[in-house]
Design a protein with these regions (language model features):
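Active-site neighborhoods of divalent-metal-dependent phosphate/nucleic-acid chemistry enzymes
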Residues: 2-5, 86-132
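Short loop/helix-cap segments at secondary-structure boundaries that form the rim of catalytic
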Residues: 134-141
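A short, flexible beta-alpha/helix-coil linker loop
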Residues: 22-24, 58, 96
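Short acidic-hydrophobic, aromatic-tinged amphipathic segments that line or gate anion-handling sites
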Residues: 88-91, 143-147
Length: 151
C-alpha cells in the first residue's frame, strides 16, 4: 500500500483531475476502492486541493442511472456538476486536438486521451485514476493510481 499521507501532502494547493472511475467508486460506494478515494474527495471538500474533471465525465456517470431510470442518482450526479465542488472543464478544440495527439502518439483509448488532454489543458498537476492504460501510457501529467492506496 502506498503512502496516502505523503501523496495528499504533495497534492496540497494543486489542481487534481478526477478520472470518471474515481467518482463512480465514490458514488456507488464500491468495495475495495471507495476507501482509497475518500481521502482525496475529503481534501477537495476541505479546500486543500482543487478537484477537477471534464464534462465528458458527466456523460459517463449518467449512463448507468439512465439505463435503469434512476432519477435520484441522475439528480445527485447532476448536482455534483452544478455546484462549486468540482471545476468542470469544457472539451474545447485545444483539448480535443491534444487528445488526438495523445491518441496518436501514446496509444491511449480516445476517452482516456480526452480525459488526459482536459487535465493537461486545465493545468492539473495530477490525474487520479484507476485505469491501468492511463497509468501505464499517459505522459505530460503525473498519473496517480488509487490502486496503490487500497486496503
Amino acid at each position: 500500500m502506498g503512502n496516502m499521507a505523503q501523496m495528499l501532502l504533495r497534492m496540497q494547493g494543486q489542481r487534481v483531475y478526477f478520472d470518471t472511475n474515481i467518482l463512480i467508486y465514490v458514488l456507488d460506494n464500491t468495495a475495495n476502492h471507495v476507501d482509497a478515494c475518500l481521502p482525496f474527495i475529503s481534501a477537495v471538500a476541505e479546500g486543500t486541493m482543487t478537484g477537477c474533471t471534464g464534462e465528458i465525465t458527466l456523460a459517463e456517470l449518467l449512463v448507468k442511472p439512465m439505463r435503469t431510470n434512476d432519477m435520484v442518482s441522475m439528480t445527485k450526479i447532476k448536482s455534483l456538476f452544478d455546484g462549486d465542488y468540482l471545476e468542470v472543464f469544457a472539451h474545447d478544440r485545444k483539448s480535443l486536438e491534444l487528445a488526438a495527439h495523445l491518441r496518436a502518439t501514446q496509444g491511449l483509448r480516445m476517452i482516456d486521451a480526452i480525459h488526459t488532454a482536459a487535465a493537461i489543458v486545465g493545468n492539473c498537476k495530477f490525474m487520479l485514476t484507476h485505469d491501468q492504460q492511463i497509468n501505464q501510457q499517459a505522459r505530460g501529467i503525473e498519473v496517480v493510481d488509487i490502486g496503490a492506496f487500497r486496503n
